[in-house]
Amino acid sequence: WNPFKELERAGQRVRDAVISAAPAVATVGQAAAIARG
């Protein structure tokens, strides 16, 4: 068992989640800004 390998895998999962979530977050932020006027 290699803790560094496990950490690397977890980091990649987190990065993938952030990358896939970023556009949605930006869209929601834009919509909120437009709604506020």
From Swiss-Prot:
Modified residues (Glycine amide): 37
GO cellular component, as recorded: extracellular region
GO biological process, one term: defense response to Gram-positive bacterium
Domain of life: Eukaryota
Record's keyword terms, sorted: Amidation, Antibiotic, Antimicrobial, Immunity, Innate immunity, Secreted
Keyword Phosphoprotein: no
Cross-referenced Pfam families: Cecropin (PF00272)
Main location: secreted
UniProt-annotated location(s): Secreted
Family of the protein in this entry: Belongs to the cecropin family.
Role summary: Cecropins have lytic and antibacterial activity against several Gram-positive and Gram-negative bacteria.
Protein name, UniProt field: Bactericidin B-2
